[in-house]
Amino acid sequence: MPLFKSRIKSALVHRREQGLTRQLKVLENSNGPLLTSEGSSFINFSSNDYLGLANDSELVDAWQVGLSQYGAGSAASPLVTGFSPAHRNLETQLCEWLGFERAILFNSGFSANQALLFSLLEKDDFLLQDKLNHASLMEAGMLSPATMKRFKHNDTQHLESLLSQTPQSLVVTEGVFSMDGDQAPLRQISSLTNQYDSWLAVDDAHGIGVLGDNGAGSCNAAQISPDILVVTFGKAFGLSGAAILCSSEVGDYLTQFARHHVYSTAMPPSQAVALSHACQMIQTQEWRREKLTELGALYAEQMNGVKGFIDTQTPIKPFLIGEAQAALSIAEELKRNQVWVTAIRSPTVPIGTARLRITLTANHSQEQILQLTDSLLQAIERSNDSGSKPSIESSFELKKEAQ
């Protein structure tokens, strides 16, 4: 059997034997609070559309205006003919809102993170990353010529011990962690990077739009200004794409050397128009963040004290189960009550820390939150009665060790 065919077959067999096979599901209306699968309706608690913009008629109209003005696509990379007034306007809005000199646009957060690390890091550099950073950051760090070390999750003492050995490093953390919903201690991390003459880059994919004054994100909430800020448009913005916010000089550097930017077709200008409108909606429609806070408090009130419940100050509400099969079983039980929650398993999270990743949006109602919590409590009780009790206590220990 040819090498690649054999390798592919072996990897697929191994993944199936582990019970970790992933599959695409065709869903309708999945950008709203109610999705449809195979003719059945479910309350959607798996979306990253935190502010409920993805299917908002105001934002849809803005994109249609952009389509009428600019047509369907950009037709070229930014440095050829793909950079329009709509792109420039979006960059300017982001800079004025978030307090940076330059914004460089990308087609995804994954490509923005990879472009950042690949273009900045050289052979003798040191990269220090939080152990729970996104796969895009970890992969870029491992493939870069720099020496990468990981510090324990949100552990500033461990970070300082590494910085004391390797000053003038690039420190990278997320603002809000996508699988745990917790926040980085940004003020302390910023202080350490200043102390050890290092740079700080923050990926705020899950904080922008949700935290801070007028939704300006995790760094604004922590009252810090990192050297580099990555924001993505696929969560609170309700769209897709990303931007790197930085100084004018770093922006010039990325324009020359960030290959994901230089050699990719620019996002459609109509999308940039819609993103500019999303910026305005995020900053002016405070009721969306207030609604999220209200729903988060209701969820915590119902689940507080239940084993597996993890309290967070963000829309991401992980419920820790432990074993992968138990997490899948409870997720399926929830579907029988018309509640759609995704079970997250290895390799996305460490073995033994499988969880339900519950996400709240401003489009949910209090009644839907109560249906979620009632259904989850019933599913856990049935799981315990059937003898397949989730290994919640052991999973906490495994998670602690993994960090």
UniProtKB/Swiss-Prot annotation:
What are the alphabetically sorted keywords of the record?
A: Biotin biosynthesis, Pyridoxal phosphate, Transferase
Catalyses which reaction(s): 6-carboxyhexanoyl-[ACP] + L-alanine + H(+) = (8S)-8-amino-7-oxononanoate + holo-[ACP] + CO2
* UniProt record, GO biological process: biotin biosynthetic process
Q: Which domain of life is it from?
A: Bacteria
List positions binding substrate: 22, 134, 348
- Role: Catalyzes the decarboxylative condensation of pimeloyl-[acyl-carrier protein] and L-alanine to produce 8-amino-7-oxononanoate (AON), [acyl-carrier protein], and carbon dioxide.
* UniProt name for this protein: 8-amino-7-oxononanoate synthase
Give the lineage.
Bacteria, Pseudomonadati, Pseudomonadota, Gammaproteobacteria, Vibrionales
